[in-house]
């Protein structure tokens, strides 16, 4: 029994050290461009370790809240907004590993895709595209991104 106690204590100390080092690297850090509007009920991005989770972004102008009339301009502005969040965390589109796209009209898919491929370099991230009935404001699309260094 006396020999087992030091082994058990060593085992517990090793587990505790592993738990502390794991938890220390898992702190959440808010990532946002300097011009990200204040007072929103969500963060633009959250970095945990080397992974950045970007909130759903639309093609609305960050200052005016207006969505461009031409859909392709809305898509590009959406990716510009995402790019600003990525850049604020020291990432870019090449770091994207997963993308979720929400479209209010699936007939817009080919037009969205044409702009999408100009923004995401090869190898492109995994992607899910979902048709939805509505999004906030006048947005026709919303995109979330997970990026990793």
Regions found by a protein language model. Give the residues of each.
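N-terminal presequence-like segments and the immediate start of the first folded domain
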Residues: 4-80, 84-89, 94-97, 103-149
């Amino acid at each position: 029994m006396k020999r087992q106690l030091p082994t058990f204590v060593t085992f517990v100390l090793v587990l505790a050290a592993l738990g502390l080092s794991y938890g220390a690297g898992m702190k959440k850090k808010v990532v946002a461009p300097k011009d990200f509007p204040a007072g929103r009920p969500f963060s633009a991005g959250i970095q945990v370790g080397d992974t950045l989770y970007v909130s759903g972004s639309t093609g609305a102008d960050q200052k005016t809240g207006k969505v461009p009339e031409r859909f392709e301009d809305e898509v590009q502005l959406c990716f510009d907004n995402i790019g600003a969040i990525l850049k604020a965390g020291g990432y870019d589109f090449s770091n994207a590993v997963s993308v979720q796209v929400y479209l209010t009209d699936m007939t817009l898919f080919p037009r969205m895709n044409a702009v999408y491929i100009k923004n995401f370099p090869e190898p492109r991230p995994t992607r899910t595209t979902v048709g939805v009935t509505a999004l906030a404001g006048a947005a026709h699309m919303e995109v979330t991104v997970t990026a990793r260094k």
